[in-house]
């Protein structure tokens, strides 16, 4: 990227209450990448530890007003997280859905029928496990939709946003690992 967004306090005596967002050019003097994280997923977006040492940014790079509102300083940062956590959840939910769809195809090809009419305990063990995974996916999906809906409608959603991100991540890991296990050698295609 050519720019990064940095949250920093504009008044050390006020601490986090004076946090503001700034756009910082990557080539700004004093900005360097201390460490680039090596991730397994979301490679289109780098995650890095940035070091700002005597990095001075013009006032024009400030996002929002220059006025320090002690009541809203840190709350603005948290609102950004509350708005983006459902998006992160959505990425995990998409990965999990793709794994479920591929698993369903593999099970069908193997002659395992998944039925929504028959109780899980009367089905093949792989079909019963698929139904459990699908229920887990549905719970994560609905929680993320709720958190996103609340954000869209300007309702406080800190709890739901945090829960949706946590639930979706755990569900995606559980679903993808179990899909690999149930698919056997096809799970590594």
Regions inferred by a protein language model and the residue ranges of each:
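Long, acidic (Asp/Glu-rich), low-complexity accessory segments flanking structured domains
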Residues: 53-75
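Flexible, small-/acidic-enriched active-site or ligand-binding loops
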Residues: 27-56
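Glycine-anchored helix-breaking recognition loops at helix->coil/strand junctions
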Residues: 36-40, 66-67, 108
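Short clusters of hydrophobic/aromatic residues that line enzyme substrate/ligand-binding pockets
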Residues: 31-33, 40-42, 62-63, 77, ...
């Amino acid at each position: 990227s050519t720019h990064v967004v940095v949250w920093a306090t504009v008044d050390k005596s006020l601490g986090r209450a004076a946090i503001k967002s700034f756009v910082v050019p990557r080539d700004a003097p004093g900005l360097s990448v201390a460490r680039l994280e090596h991730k397994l997923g979301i490679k289109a977006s780098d995650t890095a530890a940035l070091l700002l040492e005597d990095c001075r940014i013009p006032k024009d790079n400030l996002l929002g007003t220059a006025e320090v509102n002690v009541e809203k300083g840190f709350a603005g940062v948290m609102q950004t997280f509350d708005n983006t956590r459902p998006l992160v959840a959505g990425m995990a939910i998409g990965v999990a859905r793709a794994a479920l769809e591929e698993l369903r195809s593999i099970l069908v090809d193997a002659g395992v029928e998944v039925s929504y009419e028959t109780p899980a305990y009367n089905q093949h063990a792989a079909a019963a496990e698929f139904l459990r995974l699908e229920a887990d996916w549905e719970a994560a999906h609905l929680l993320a939709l709720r958190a996103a809906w609340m954000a869209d409608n300007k309702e406080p959603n800190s709890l739901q946003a945090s829960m949706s991100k946590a639930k979706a991540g755990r569900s995606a890991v559980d679903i993808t690992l179990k899909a690999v296990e149930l698919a056997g050698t096809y799970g590594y295609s």
